[in-house]
Amino acid sequence: MSTTPFAGIADFYNQRVQTYGYDPRACDYGRAESQRRKFSVLASATDYNGLSVLDVGCGFADYAGFLAERHPGIEYHGIDLSPAMIEKARQARPDLDLRVANLFDLPSDEFYDVVSANGIFYLLGTEAPALMRRLVSEMFRRCRRGVVFNSLSTWASVQEQGEYYADPLEVVAWCRELSPWVVLRHDYLPHDFTVFVARQSSLP
């Protein structure tokens, strides 16, 4: 797998950690309230109680605490491209399994109940459409129950230059090639959407 644009993304976040330290600004989150809404939607995708979760692009692993408060008994694992992010995250949460790793480089037999990603696609550059699809496909390959991820949306009325905005309906279309059980949420922020792709129906 090519290191581009992953090396550049790692450098971007390493620099932000150097600038801001252990601070939400290092994660390029924007407003705390918008991040809380994103976490809330991700956490509502399924009943996580007792499940293993891989958080791809975990940053400071803030999502771990958010999940644990709402879903006791989860087994959280986090990976991130940025060594600086993981170093700070380990200092704050030494109890968690946190690694510097690229999703594509994990052992082929490493699986989790749910694979999650929050805000990892917007810096993918010109390769973004194809690479987003490859990343989600790899996430789905490694899940037992489902994957949940969010992205900036082309439905946003204002878009930041240089950031990737995905078309929600196009994303749903190729997610349906992975599974017929797909949920789209575009009701919590005007510029963001979340997709949950399950291996089987959530209804009895």
Q: Language-model features: where?
A:
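N-terminal, positively charged/glycine-rich alpha-helical extensions of SAM-dependent methyltransferases
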Residues: 1-23
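Conserved alpha-helix/loop element of class I SAM-dependent methyltransferases that forms part
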Residues: 32-49
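Class I SAM-dependent methyltransferase SAM/SAH-binding core
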Residues: 54, 60-105
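A conserved beta-strand element that flanks and buttresses the S-adenosyl-L-methionine
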Residues: 116
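A short, conserved alpha-helix within the catalytic core of class I
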Residues: 124-136
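Conserved beta-strand signature within the Rossmann-like core of class I S-adenosyl-L-methionine
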Residues: 143-153
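Short alpha-helix
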Residues: 163-179
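Core SAM-dependent methyltransferase catalytic element
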Residues: 186-204
